[in-house]
Amino acid sequence: MSDEKTHDQTDPLIGRLIDQRYRVTRRLARGGMATVYVAQDERLERPVALKVMHPHLAESDAFVERFHREARAAARIVHPGVVSVFDQGVVSGQGFLVMELIDGTNLRALLNAQGAFTIPRALRYTTDILEALRAAHRMGVIHRDIKPENILVPTDGPAKVADFGLARAVSEGSMFTTGNMLGTVAYIAPEIALTTEADARSDLYSVGIMLYEMLTGAVPWADESALQIASHHVSDDVPSPSATLPWIPREIDDLVAALTTRDPANRCADASDALDLVARAAASTPSDIANRRAEVAHEDSR
């Protein structure tokens, strides 16, 4: 029996009607900030994803206010590459979001299963993510926690970015949650590590780290501690993918460098600029390496 099915038998929310509308049917996943359930919207007769914040995040009225404010901001983003937010509320003192339920997986699961991607596939996901970020940034919404776990990959259609606003709701209260630096440290922009301040370029940095990982099969400095990794983000340039994979074209190295320049002033100015660079890199990829990918250990090879 899977862990989630076991939790279904003990979780008090399973079977409960939330807000006189959402019938919780099963637990989908548990993350650092919330537990995600599948629920049935009994009013509109459709399945939805119900994300319930962990209790320790709702210990102050200030957090609850920030949570609702950021949820409203996220709900304004209407784009095929952004997971839609339908509703919000409070259950047993814990804030919740009602979101679009995606039939598919996430980028982390795909990387775990396959190790690394070909250049065209990595650039396709990068394009999807940047197009979603462009829409959000134009609405004044910064994600702050771009990482593979927050990139959902449907069975059809573009990849979708999830959890807009949640990281900011937490970070305005504290840089730390349950002893860990907010935002997965492997993807954190230098300015967030230093000051917790972020803008659109901070999200682009995280996209650059994900692109590096999609190509090489690992994030930079993967074998070091969280504090050491944060220090590298602040003090060191992200290595070129070609340092690990000599066959990677220079245009890909240049793209990763443009996204991950430590000084935001010298980074890609916005998602539109980044998309132009991605298109150029895609057009310049030689056909004889288009199907190559890094040979790394992964679940499918075990």
What are these model-derived regions, one by one?
Residues 24-31, 36:
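Protein kinase glycine-rich loop
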Residues 92-106, 110:
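Conserved short submotifs of the Hanks-type protein kinase catalytic core
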Residues 125-126:
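Activation segment signature within eukaryotic-like protein kinase domains
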Residues 54-76:
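AlphaC helix of the eukaryotic protein kinase fold
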Residues 129-141:
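Protein kinase catalytic-loop region centered on the HRD/HxD motif
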Residues 88:
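Activation-segment/catalytic-loop signature of the eukaryotic protein kinase fold
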Residues 186-285:
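C-terminal lobe helix-coil module of Hanks-type protein kinase domains
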